[in-house]
Amino acid sequence: MIDLHCHSTASDGSFTPTQLVSLAEECGLKALALTDHDTLDGLGEFRRADENSPVECIPGIELASQDAENSYAGYHIVGLFLGAEASEEMQRLMQRCIEAREARNLAILERLRHHGIELSLTEVESAAGGEVIGRPHIAQALVNRGVVLSIQGAFDRYLGSGKPAYVRRRLPSPETAIAAIHSMGGVAIWAHPFTRGNYTVRRIHEMAVHLKGIGLDGMEAYYALHTVTQVKNALEICEDVGLLPSGGSDFHGAVTRSIRLGVGTGKLNVPDSILADLEACRDQRASAR
């Protein structure tokens, strides 16, 4: 069993990269990919943990992107097998992501003020505890203030899509995300395709064709929140379009307590057999560089 999608404290997870590797060993995983949101910051520690672990540790990332030319809600692109050195292309993209996230955070605080909630950036930084600040930390600051009872309550009332303090983040195009992943020798995977909007199988197929045309290598067919039917449909799309199937739990630790590493809600089983094709794709890219 393998898990090619999880998050650490370098983004919005509650386990450090080292703790994730230890947990993967306890779970009996053959391979684990660390795919933090829009950052490479946890990969150094992840690689060091790999030195003494029987688990194959695969350096990765998850990049949020938006295609301005269609109405799709957005694509999350996972990069697997990233090289040790960040490419100039990836560094530029990371800087854009940082600037966009910081601008969004300030805009959210301004909207909260407009609704009578004076929340300072210092309070949010305290809630983040040194992590990259995002909406979950603003939510925690609202909990700390007593404005809401829970993080989920903060999203339901203020921070979720369509709520009073929601601010859409400026995102790179999927072409840019895929190219940045390839610039580091990585394999580009469309993450959790059936969870980003209420789309038909036909529509998902159309999106897969579009992404394949701009360089996508694979699609996350196995995913913690995919139904059995969705897994089947995703595998059929991969076969039809010529994409490699991938899969993972999207484990965040305490942030999503119902999702466990390796097994998701308990039914996830990402087969070891898909790893060979993904590694072959990585090797093919390396030989072409």
Language-model features, listed with the residues they occupy:
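A metal-dependent hydrolase metal-coordination microenvironment
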Residues: 1-134, 214, 220-241, 245-256
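Conserved, well-ordered active-site substructure
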Residues: 259-271
